[in-house]
C-alpha cells in the first residue's frame, strides 16, 4: 500500500536552485519533504545522475504508516533530467517503487512498504 508523505511542498521550497546533474544536491532532505514530478514521456532525458539521499529522524520503524510521525530512515534515489530551458524534473524511488504527482499539483513521493508493493497514487505509469 502506498502512503503519501504529509506536508506536501513544491520541490523548489527545499532545493535552493533548479536541479541539474551536479554534485550540489543536499545530502539530507528536511523531514516531511517531497519531490516531483516524474519525467513526462515527451521529455528528453539529457544530463542525468542519481544520488542516495536520506531523511532520518527519531524512529527506526520501517512501517509506512509511521513515517509521518517518526520520520524514520528513508533511502531515496533521485534522478534529474534537464530540458534546454534548464528546468529539471525529478523522480524519487523509495524501497523500489514509487510514483509522483505533477509538480503543479504539489508534487509528492508515494511511499511503499516493500519493493513488491505497487504504487496506487495517480498519475503513475509502469516501468519503474
Swiss-Prot record:
In this chain, composition skew of type Polar residues spans 44-61
Domain of life according to the entry: Eukaryota
Query: What segment(s) does the record annotate as region Disordered?
Result: 25-61
The name this protein carries in UniProt is Uncharacterized protein encoded by LINC01561
